[in-house]
């Protein structure tokens, strides 16, 4: 019985380390959106998408995160653990902007959920004000490459 408990604890520790390492192994890509050139972390798995930009007290002027999903759909986003305002930009499978939420502020429980009225494949999160500053709006084509698309 004692060994089963020890094995269970070791298994949980291994799972936690694996999840943390997956979240830390972040890929990056350059995103060209309007007049903006952004260096984006790629969130292409559940662990990275759940963490998102949460816990960061600031976001650099040319920093972003691109959330990658397997198929188009309703991609709800929330501000869990966010400490700074952001712009949320939804893109379809052709990497065309379908919706923008400007200057979304951090919130507390219960978290407000933000959605695009159109199906999307990607979500780009940037520092608040980036979309307006660089003319990122619905209809704009965005360019970026992902490792599995090269």
Model-derived features with residue positions:
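Compact, glycine-rich, soluble single-domain proteins
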Residues: 14-150
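Hydrophobic membrane-insertion alpha-helices, especially the h-region
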Residues: 2-18
């Amino acid at each position: 019985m004692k060994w089963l408990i020890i094995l269970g604890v070791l298994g949980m520790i291994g799972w936690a380390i694996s999840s943390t390492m997956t979240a830390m192994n972040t890929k990056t890509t350059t995103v060209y959106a309007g007049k903006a050139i952004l260096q984006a972390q790629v969130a292409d798995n559940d662990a990275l998408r759940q963490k998102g930009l949460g816990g960061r007290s600031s976001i650099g002027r040319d920093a972003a995160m691109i959330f990658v999903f397997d198929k188009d759909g309703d991609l709800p986003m929330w501000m869990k653990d966010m400490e700074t305002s952001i712009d949320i930009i939804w893109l379809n499978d052709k990497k065309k902007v379908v919706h923008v939420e400007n200057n979304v502020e951090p919130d507390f429980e219960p978290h407000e959920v933000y959605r695009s009225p159109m199906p999307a494949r990607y979500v780009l999160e940037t520092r608040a004000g980036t979309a307006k500053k660089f003319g990122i709006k619905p209809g704009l084509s965005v360019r970026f490459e992902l490792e599995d698309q090269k």
